[in-house]
Amino acid sequence: SMRNFDYITNPAKLLTPEIVQMVGSIHEHKGKQELFLEANIDELKTLLEITLIQSTGASNRIEGIFTSDKRLEELVSQKAEPRNRSEQEIAGYREVLATIHESYEYITPKPNIILQLHRDLYSYSQGNIGGTYKNSDNVITETDAEGHQKARFIPVPAFQTAEAIDELCARFLEAWEANLIDKLILIP
């Protein structure tokens, strides 16, 4: 294997006493959450809308994609059509986030699903760039204060990407179905 996709021993290393306590607390509160959800559905819908807008804005800013708060809200609420490349990427992100939110129980991490979500991510963009693996190598770089560039992250080479995604998904699903590690720890 070209990368280490070990979802059994690597996640087990995360099980510090503090993490185990947090996971237990999350599971304990999960039952109480159902009652709270039923009693406060309107407030939660409002919170969800705010969260979707903030999450979309934050995730896109990480990628260097910016727009005004007003435009972001309009795009996420589907009250506006994207005007430029940044807004097209925001609209695509909104679509994928909505798919995950509405159908997460039915989404299995498999290569074809990942490619479908990638296609949807770029569905508003020009040039059919979504839904396929990269066809050229890339390196994520950073520039220091003196202007020197260095590799921050070296992704899998293009010719190995499909194989790496197959392996990643297979190892993750294997660990998920083995049920040896709490799923909250297993999720990357």
Where are the regions that the model predicts?
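FIC/Doc superfamily catalytic core
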Residues: 1-188
